[in-house]
């Protein structure tokens, strides 16, 4: 795989080390987002961060997390590239900017829809011992089906012991414990979500300062202007559970999703946001994180260490081919009758693909061989 396999479109964003573009994959003519990082410009630690993002993203599968498709090193451009799901709806930061220009506020229903999806994506990460560490409006994307996606896992870590120490994140969304340079846990992400929820209501962050030092002091104090009366007390209560200076008293993602307020909102929201994408998402699935990707001495060898590509269309084609092969192997009479244009369909007896896959993967084909 190389850059030549894609047609480059609009530039979505550019930083000091790389860029994100809309690309069209020639093989399936579908649009994706490609993050390209110039390896030559990165320090050793930054290279490992890029590989860590690939490692984590490729291990995840949830409707509220940006989907991974493939990663490759392009020898011509010397760039490490991650091909991801393209969210046509932009990000929450763009939505806020649009509302500021139009002098509009989001409806409360929209905000509840969004915050529930953010929390469900975050629960999936936390259940798998992953801290995002850079949750902000600009890192939350919206699909064409209006499904929210947590993205940019460059700073995410697997916290096996439940704590982290590295001071990182975006200042407006950093928790008091990070500002104090103290060890922090998953509750630090909750603070960030509280800042996001507040910003969706007020169209500005809860804490702002004339300088970085001033901002830090305000965050540590934890005092913010109340949310306007246009919104309900329920929103104010949920924000107050998140923006608690003491992380031990701050709500966890499970406590929030199981609160009476959100249980009621979730039951109403589900009626509106259920799509095929959500239905197939494995929300409670425990992920098998791939092993740490080690940086080889020769960068040309890095492609051998990267995870396999994952495109839905190709996976479905593989499944269909696999299904036909298994069906012909187990039940040749079905194939013969179908070849003879017999209209009789035996698939219902064996529950189609599920039955066949269940037995072939358990090794029962040896019995019949």
Model-based region annotation:
Residues 19:
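Conserved N-lobe ATP-binding subsite of Hanks-type protein kinase domains
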Residues 31, 36-60:
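Conserved N-lobe beta3->alphaC-helix segment of eukaryotic protein kinase catalytic domains
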Residues 70-72:
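A short, aromatic-enriched beta-strand patch in the conserved N-lobe beta-sheet
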Residues 77-91, 95:
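Conserved short submotifs of the Hanks-type protein kinase catalytic core
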Residues 114-115:
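Activation segment signature within eukaryotic-like protein kinase domains
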Residues 189:
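Conserved catalytic-loop aspartate of Hanks-type protein kinases
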